Amino acid sequence: MAAPVDLELKKAFTELQAKVIDTQQKVKLADIQIEQLNRTKKHAHLTDTEIMTLVDETNMYEGVGRMFILQSKEAIHNQLLEKQKIAEEKIKELEQKKSYLERSVKEAEDNIREMLMARRAQ
């Protein structure tokens, strides 16, 4: 009877190991994306700060591909604020995803611990 339990534990450990490795990769990817979004947000904030120091009648050009489009100061300001808002929302989503992944790995580890405790009790 010990052999089936050992096979069951071995299978559970290999599944846990695969899940941990997969989760670690996903968490690293989420961290990289969060860092990139933080840089984007900071860049937009700094650009907006510089733009707001200029007088309202200043001509501003937005780079679009290989050309530049004349924009008002207010339009560029609104675009930069929207960019910051979108980055902040994506950061929150990634943080939630990251915490979910970490929680799921912890639950899997707890299940294996319970399995080991049940085996020792037998």
Curated annotation (Swiss-Prot):
GO molecular function: amyloid-beta binding; protein folding chaperone; unfolded protein binding
One Gene Ontology term from the biological process aspect of the record: negative regulation of amyloid fibril formation
Modified sites of kind N-acetylalanine: 2
InterPro entries referenced in this protein's UniProt entry, alphabetically: PFD_beta-like, Prefoldin
Protein name: Prefoldin subunit 1
Gene3D superfamilies recorded: 1.10.287.370
Protein species of origin: Pongo abelii
PANTHER family: PREFOLDIN SUBUNIT 1, PREFOLDIN SUBUNIT 1-RELATED
A GO cellular component annotation in the UniProt record: prefoldin complex
Family according to the record: Belongs to the prefoldin subunit beta family.
The keyword tRNA-binding belongs to this UniProt entry's keyword annotation: no
This protein's UniProt keywords: Acetylation, Chaperone
Functional summary from the UniProt entry: Binds specifically to cytosolic chaperonin (c-CPN) and transfers target proteins to it. Binds to nascent polypeptide chain and promotes folding in an environment in which there are many competing pathways for nonnative proteins.
Top-level lineage group: Eukaryota
Cysteines paired by S-S bonds: none
Complex and partners: Heterohexamer of two PFD-alpha type and four PFD-beta type subunits.
